[in-house]
From Swiss-Prot:
Additional note from the record: Negative results: has no effect on voltage-gated sodium channel Nav1.8/SCN10A (in complex with SCN1B).
Record has Secreted as a keyword: yes
Any Gene Ontology CC annotation: nematocyst
Main location: secreted
Protein name per UniProt: Delta-actitoxin-Bgr2a
InterPro entries per UniProt: Anenome_toxin, Myo_ane_neurotoxin_sf
Lineage: Eukaryota, Metazoa, Cnidaria, Anthozoa, Hexacorallia
Length: 48
């Protein structure tokens, strides 16, 4: 899937490593968690 920015990645996506995986269908899979607290985005930003 596409990469997305977790809260722990820093305030901007420029020059930072995107450690999350964008999950569009439903919630994050089992064993993963949503690593994005807030913001206008589609789906969930999931991380193992």
């Amino acid at each position: 899937g596409a990469s997305c920015r977790c809260d722990s990645d820093g305030p901007t996506s420029r020059g930072n490593t995107l450690t999350g995986t964008l999950w569009l269908i439903g919630r994050c899979p089992s064993g993963w968690h949503n690593c994005r607290g807030s913001g206008p985005f589609i789906g969930y930003c999931c991380k193992q």
